[in-house]
């Protein structure tokens, strides 16, 4: 038995202000019915004794700690660039003026 009718899909489409063709209504009714069937199967799973969790992973922070290390200054980097203007790399324009 279908869990959602074609008329219910048409009603939902009207509420969402979607103009659906007859073919689309039939197609979406079938797709939504399949989705609802899958949801029903998941809801039927016995989870008695299973503790609820929002994240099954126990890893809290797997990144390295931040460390300040010496690096090049802005001037040292820009001195190696082919062209720099106002403390920034100068590169050829790739987009037109209309952008």
Swiss-Prot record:
GO terms for cellular component: peptidoglycan-based cell wall. It is an enzyme of class 6 (ligase). InterPro entries: Asp/Glu-ADT_sf_sub_c, GatC. Its EC number is 6.3.5.-. GO terms for biological process: glutaminyl-tRNAGln biosynthesis via transamidation; regulation of translational fidelity; translation. One of its GO terms (molecular function) is ATP binding. It catalyses: L-glutamyl-tRNA(Gln) + L-glutamine + ATP + H2O = L-glutaminyl-tRNA(Gln) + L-glutamate + ADP + phosphate + H(+); L-aspartyl-tRNA(Asn) + L-glutamine + ATP + H2O = L-asparaginyl-tRNA(Asn) + L-glutamate + ADP + phosphate + 2 H(+). Signal peptide: none annotated. Keywords: ATP-binding, Ligase, Nucleotide-binding, Protein biosynthesis. Pfam families: GatC (PF02686). Allows the formation of correctly charged Asn-tRNA(Asn) or Gln-tRNA(Gln) through the transamidation of misacylated Asp-tRNA(Asn) or Glu-tRNA(Gln) in organisms which lack either or both of asparaginyl-tRNA or glutaminyl-tRNA synthetases. The reaction takes place in the presence of glutamine and ATP through an activated phospho-Asp-tRNA(Asn) or phospho-Glu-tRNA(Gln). PANTHER family: GLUTAMYL-TRNA(GLN) AMIDOTRANSFERASE SUBUNIT C, MITOCHONDRIAL. Belongs to the GatC family. Heterotrimer of A, B and C subunits. This is Glutamyl-tRNA(Gln) amidotransferase subunit C.
